[in-house]
């Protein structure tokens, strides 16, 4: 999968860095999301866990080209969102 990142105009680095999330962590979540659902407008929201155990929310837009996405931002899940994710995961058969 090809992953492009929104670059922060101030730093020239991926916007995810502002939230303490690097490219490898985003790739790990997108490769095996626990949830992937529609977001606002054309975006999608992937929730998942990195190999290091961090739970992240990744906001992205699928590119017209198959197998390619544009990541807008990503950040760690807060305690309330993490509890909700775990509750939803328990309910699934």
Predicted regions and their residues:
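Ribonuclease/tRNase effector modules and their secretory precursors
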Residues: 1-93
């Amino acid at each position: 999968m090809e992953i492009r990142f929104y670059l922060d105009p101030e730093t020239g680095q991926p916007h995810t860095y502002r939230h303490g999330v690097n490219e490898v962590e985003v790739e790990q979540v997108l490769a095996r999301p626990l949830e992937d659902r529609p977001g606002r407008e054309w975006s999608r929201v992937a929730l998942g866990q990195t190999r290091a155990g961090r739970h992240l929310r990744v906001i992205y837009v699928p590119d017209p080209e198959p197998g390619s996405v544009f990541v807008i931002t990503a950040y760690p899940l807060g305690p309330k969102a993490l509890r909700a994710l775990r509750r939803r995961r328990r309910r699934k058969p």
